[in-house]
Amino acid sequence: MPAILEIPLPLAETEITTTGQTFSGTNLLRTYIMKALSLRLFVLIAALSIALTQSARASNPVVDWNQIALTTALTTPGTQIYLTYVNLAMYDAVNAIDRRYQQYGPEFHGPRDASKEAAAISAAYQTLLYYFPAQTAALQAQYDSAIAGIPDDQAKASGIAIGQIAAARIVALRANDGRGASVPYTYPAAPEPGVWIATPPAFAPPAMPWVAQMVPFTMRSASQFLPVNGPPDLGSRQWAREYNEVKLLGAVNSTVRTPAQTEIALFWTANPVATYFGAFRQLAVDRHLSISKSARLLAMLSVAFTDAGIGCWNAKYHFSFWRPVTAIPNGDIDGNPETEADPTWLPLAPTPPHPEFPAAHGCATGAIAKTLENFFGTPDVKFTINSAATHTTHTYYTVGQLETEAYWARIYAGFHYRHSLNEGFRLGHRVAKQLNQDFFQPRHADDH
């Protein structure tokens, strides 16, 4: 993460694709080659590509049901929590059969010749059915279609039963975990120095304060990784530097933020759960991961994402620090002579409705980046992320590139100060480190 006050050029580190074109020399060469091919050869190659992609997806129900889970839960507050329930159920169901990794929930074993495909489908279906009974008809139709693709034999029957057990155990394990609880949170109606208030344009109430009190999946408590270094003192030079940085770079009418930096900021305003897990599913397909490894990857990433979110929300509602959209128009009340107020200042994009410190994208991205590095054993992981906000695609070649871009995106957007991002990434890294040490580990050295 950046340590000095400077504006990097993250675009030099990533490829950006828009309207189907990737701006790189490789893509240009590929375009000329494809134009030189005969139409018949092109059609054959395209058909083969589609067939291979469909085959890869059909053979990996873990990937398919991660998408189904996301679609099912997408409009429900705490989407990532439900996704984690489903991914853990699939992970435990598959591991009950092949026993390659530590199970997350209570240990149980099924026949080794049981169908892992049926187990994963059954586990995901039963978990979603429990949490989303109103969507029974749609889920039933998707389940019937998926399970029909598996031959009717004892292996299938055993797999279905194992999936049912895994789902029931995860549901029982997470009973009364605080999801959706009524947690009161009071905040001022008018600006006070350093204190969060509802922000324009919607002035929405604080989002999901109950997440701050949830029982985590791997942390000992929601506050285990509460940052020791809280927000900067309002009278400090550090506060003045960071205030003026986001004031300059994050303004809706900034004259110093480049078009490339604006695109980065807006790219990262898309729904982070949908954005990240779309990339993770494609990564599993691109790497040709087995069902077992796909289940482990998605379980690790979803737990890291969710626990980082729980720790982050706990810190947000503990410190309750003000956003730039509140601080900058009220710079004259913070007691710092170097923070000149601008009553007309607005950020590039609407500010999310929850306290500023620490940065949620820092917490989540830090946890995700380190978990990817731990899973693959290297920071050099190539993957692509699509943004529904900008309809552009960014390709990363290392997890460090992802972290750098996500870091600066929140400053360019006018959402966060530098210290908040530093502490957010630190929290996410700590979550990922503990997860990797204590959970989802191979039973044998050659099972990585």
What are the roles of these predicted feature ranges?
Residues 3-6, 12-15:
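Acidic, Ala/Val/Gly-enriched low-complexity intrinsically disordered segments
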Residues 42-51:
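Bacterial N-terminal signal peptides
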Residues 6-9, 46, 412:
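Short N-terminal alpha-helical targeting/association segments
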